[in-house]
Amino acid sequence: MAYLLHAQLFLLTTFILVLNMRLCPVLGHFLGGIEKSSMEEEGASEALNYAVNEYNEKNSDLYLSRVVEVKDVQKQVVAGTKFFFDVILGKTICLKTQGDLTNCPLNEEADQQEHEFCSFVVHDIPWENYIVLLSSSCHSI
C-alpha cells in the first residue's frame, strides 16, 4: 500500500514540475544558458555604451561612431552577466578628440554615411566594479 502512495506522489510531483516548466518558461531555461534580453535589462545599456567606447578607442577612424539601431540583445548569467549585442553603428561628425557621444549627430552627407554591423560580447560583474569587452566583430553594410 505504501508503494502505491509513493508512486502516486511521484507522479503528482512530476506532473506539477512539468506544468510549472510549461507555464513559466524561465524555469525551462538551462542555468547559465544564453537567453533573449532587451536594452531595458539592468546593466544592458551600460554594457553597450562600454562596448561602443572600446570600439571607438581601438579603431583607426578619425570620427566617433554611435549606435543607430540595436538588432538583438541576449544575456547569459554567469559570475555576473555576459551581454551579446548585435547593433548597427553609424559614423558621426564628431572627431575622436571630442570624446563625448551624447550630443554627437550622425554624418548626414550621402557620400559619408558609413554604417557597420557589429557584434559585441561584454562581461559585466557589477559588484566587483568589473566590465570587459570579450569580443567584437564589425563589417560594413
Swiss-Prot record:
Q: Motif Secondary area of contact in this chain: where?
A: 76-80
Tell me the InterPro entries matching this sequence.
Cystatin_dom (IPR000010), Cystatin_sf (IPR046350), Prot_inh_cystat_CS (IPR018073)
- Return the SUPFAM superfamilies for the record: Cystatin/monellin
Keywords per UniProt? Disulfide bond, Protease inhibitor, Secreted, Signal, Thiol protease inhibitor
Q: What's an example GO BP annotation here?
A: negative regulation of cell population proliferation
Q: Where in the cell is it found?
A: Secreted
Q: What is this protein called?
A: Cystatin-S
Originating gene: Cst4
